[in-house]
């Protein structure tokens, strides 16, 4: 019976689609997420400014901001969310090699990712395009929907098995939820953002080859990453390989701009 419950849970997770729609039903609609994101972003920037961690004037900031402003109109052209994005950028003084985006177009860059990797403007555009694609495709919303579906399926499976399935049974269900939908779906979102970012930077006139040189730099920084199967991101090597496959299409867009 326990095995049947685990199987039932896995099938339930894998056959339910429409994670973004499920997020809407769970109360995480686009307008609400974007509003919450705007509030959090404003609070974060206020706190960073108070701690003198918000960069608004350095040469690194100016380079990041120039790329942001150049990509923004092309990102707006691709916005099919039904919500107008109030794109905003925060550059934080930090050695961290990181950048991220919040719903509704709130982009955060750390100075460390530019300075430590000695990025060109084209390489900055590769990161910026990647993050903007996450926002445009509402990947945060999709992840919320996916997690809600996972929790629903786990609940169904646990209920079907009975309340005394034991620690081993619970551990198996949790592992199944990770492998069945959580991590692979997240890697899929990252791959979609890589592709979308490649095309977005090309539309704005940045050389898509820079996306490959960016991840080659990341590879050297990270060292050997090992297998990507249980990683939330594709391995750097896998990323580079996928980008090489998508490069001809991106270069065709880029060359039309020249």
Q: What does each model-identified segment do?
A:
Residues 4-7, 17-258:
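A Zn2+-metalloprotease active-site environment signal
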Residues 9-13:
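Hydrophobic helical h-region of N-terminal Sec-dependent signal peptides
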């Amino acid at each position: 019976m326990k095995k049947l419950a685990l199987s039932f849970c896995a099938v339930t997770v894998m056959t339910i689609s429409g994670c973004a729609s499920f997020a809407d039903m769970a109360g995480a609609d686009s307008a609400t997420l974007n509003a919450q994101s705007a509030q959090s972003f404003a609070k974060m920037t206020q706190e960073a400014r108070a701690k003198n961690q918000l960069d608004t004037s350095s040469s690194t900031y100016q380079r990041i901001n120039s790329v942001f402003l150049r990509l923004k109109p092309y990102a707006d052209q691709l916005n099919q969310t039904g919500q107008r994005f109030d794109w905003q950028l925060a550059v934080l003084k930090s050695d961290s090699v990181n950048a991220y985006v919040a719903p509704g177009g709130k982009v955060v860059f750390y100075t460390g990712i530019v300075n430590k990797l000695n990025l060109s403007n084209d390489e900055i555009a590769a990161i910026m395009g990647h993050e903007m694609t996450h926002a445009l495709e509402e990947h945060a919303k999709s992840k919320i929907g996916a997690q809600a579906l996972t929790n629903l399926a786990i609940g169904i499976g646990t209920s079907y098995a009975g309340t005394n399935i034991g620690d081993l049974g619970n551990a198996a269900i949790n592992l199944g939820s990770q492998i069945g939908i959580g991590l692979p779906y997240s890697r899929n979102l990252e791959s979609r953002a890589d592709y979308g970012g490649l095309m977005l930077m090309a539309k704005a006139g940045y050389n898509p080859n820079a996306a490959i040189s960016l991840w080659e730099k990341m590879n050297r920084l990270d060292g050997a990453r090992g297998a990507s199967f249980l990683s939330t991101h594709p391995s750097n090597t896998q990323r580079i390989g996928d980008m090489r496959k998508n490069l001809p299409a991106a270069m065709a867009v880029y060359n039309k701009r020249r």
